[in-house]
Amino acid sequence: MIIIDKNSYTVFSGGEVHLKALPCFTKKVGAYKIICKDYSMNGFFALAQAVEVIKRNHSKYHITVIYPYLPYARQDRVFDPTSPFSLKTFTKLLSSLFVTKVYVWDAHSDVGPGLINNCTNIPQHEIFAQCQVRSADLYISPDAGAYKKISKLPVASEVIALGTKIRNLTGNIIDTKIYGPTVEGKHCLIV
């Protein structure tokens, strides 16, 4: 298993990323799992370098990439014609690595996984089922999108509060509100 994080690479003065040599690159295992925990473009470039080393040194390989958080996932739409579709740009770069499989955890929407070749989204309720989550007094859904997901969780019958975001015409959040029980003094879990 290869972990890509801020300790996996160095950055030269010109901004260039250089992946540190990893012992596993010399082993002839053929199957590699890469977990990318650095969601910056430096992290992505380190991932791309790891994939390049594996492909250069092995004629047969199986590369699985895991992104616990999909970079640019929240930029899954275009608000005006002059704005970039950042998620699409990132997913094109990721797909260009031609890895065997990509897993993302609880993608913000179906858009991101749909734009990545050979991608599977691990939904929130599956992650939740595998975690040792301490019981909470109140489960908070931060927005309407998350509220849809919370209904699939085993806590769906528990006390739930719904958060909403009020945006201006440019999409910036100008206010937030929480509907439901008060959160003060309670152990809350934002889902």
Describe the role of every protein-language-model region.
Residues 1-191:
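PRPP-associated nucleotide enzymes
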